Amino acid sequence: MRIADSGDFIVDLARAGNRTKLNSKQIIIATPSSVASALVAPVSKELATLLDEIPYPPLSIVYLAYEKSAIKTPLDGFGFLVAPAEGLNILGCVWNSSLFDGRAPQGTALLTVFVGGARNPQAARLTDAELVSVAHSELQQALGIASEPQLIAITRYDRAIPQYNLGHAARVQKVESLLKEIPGLNLIGNYLHGVSTGDVIKEAERVAKEVAGLISSRP
């Protein structure tokens, strides 16, 4: 991506081996910050550096299914988070089959366990067997499970949730200040104004309305 003398953005695209160019007065980048960094680097090195420095620790997710009758704790709720003082490797657990219909057969509980993150990034890089062992044994401890899992699946994210570390608000302010110097360039992502899906949707709607208003006001 680069800016032409006219002020338009020129974007080089490659898809299925075919290359093409697009010209636009408005660009919305809705990617993780590291990807956005690479895209904006030709336009602003300073902005690219700010985006690239946002940390995303690794996270591994272990899905385990058990017979409900083997779980002593009633699964009446969302799940649980684990406080650091507990000394466990897992960060928390979501009770999928309690939250959503159709997630597991009758009489079966599907649980999602989170391992790693900023608190314990090395744990996210355990082998599959080690992850399952950790997740299962610590769920046994937390929920009183008296059986082996009937189903096991694992998903890994090398860069999971952006961290709002000390100084993040100042970083976002600087990012927004630099964007004002590049008219037409817009960023959306969970690294700016909230990590939840709701936060991102709210921000996306705001940016979309703003860009639509600018486009419709053009002569």
Q: Which role does the model predict for each range below?
A:
Residues 75-76, 92-219:
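Conserved flavin/dinucleotide-binding core of flavoenzymes
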